[in-house]
Amino acid sequence: MAGRRNGHAGRPRVGVLALQGDFREHAEILERLGAEPVEVRRPEDLRGLDGLIIPGGESTAIGNLMVHSGMLDAIRSFFYQGGAVWGTCAGMVLAASATTGPSQPLLGIMSALVERNGFGRQVHSFEADLEVKGFDRPFRGVFIRAPYFEDVGPGVEVLAEIDGRVVAARAGKVLVTAFHPELTDDTRFHEYFLREVCGSDERS
């Protein structure tokens, strides 16, 4: 894979933040695709990784856990040293630079204004077929208390929208999705992350 940051041959090593959320589902898909999944709970677990997935869950709770465990600063450092990051649902919230709601811990690694629970609470969870930039057919998105980006800054590439609301985006080495690809049988977003984001030398 071109652009491998740690220079090792063979399987890319991709961490999955295992503080909360669907980390096991992500790990199973990574394994099927030939990557080496690594559960990440402490800053030292980031060593030697090509990428990191921040799964869904409750973004404020995950953010507070990240602060108390030292993971917030560690993930920022990992990213700014060339590591790839993919945030799904709550991970999308955490990746943003600002939120429309109450203050909460954010990584600030993508220039975007996020609306938490933008599509409503759990009772309003839904599925939708998405037209995704670069995909040859629609992707079935599973939305659970999903956020969306109300606005994005320069350098952020919008990959998918619903009624003008940004639900997938990329900026260099960071990818975000408001939905849960790990809860479907469609592995295209995981393949995209491994190939295009982990394997890229591009910075945000």
UniProtKB/Swiss-Prot annotation:
GO terms for cellular component: cytosol; glutaminase complex. Signal peptide: none annotated. SUPFAM superfamilies: Class I glutamine amidotransferase-like. Pathway: Cofactor biosynthesis; pyridoxal 5'-phosphate biosynthesis. L-glutamine binds at G57, E58, S59, R116, I144, R145. PROSITE patterns: PDXT_SNO_1, PDXT_SNO_2. GO terms for molecular function: glutaminase activity; pyridoxal 5'-phosphate synthase (glutamine hydrolysing) activity. Keywords: Glutamine amidotransferase, Hydrolase, Lyase, Pyridoxal phosphate. It catalyses: aldehydo-D-ribose 5-phosphate + D-glyceraldehyde 3-phosphate + L-glutamine = pyridoxal 5'-phosphate + L-glutamate + phosphate + 3 H2O + H(+); L-glutamine + H2O = L-glutamate + NH4(+). The active site is at C89, H180, E182. InterPro entries: Class_I_gatase-like, PdxT/SNO, PdxT/SNO_CS. Belongs to the glutaminase PdxT/SNO family. In the presence of PdxS, forms a dodecamer of heterodimers. Only shows activity in the heterodimer. Catalyzes the hydrolysis of glutamine to glutamate and ammonia as part of the biosynthesis of pyridoxal 5'-phosphate. The resulting ammonia molecule is channeled to the active site of PdxS. This is Pyridoxal 5'-phosphate synthase subunit PdxT. The lineage of its organism: Bacteria, Bacillati, Actinomycetota, Rubrobacteria, Rubrobacterales.
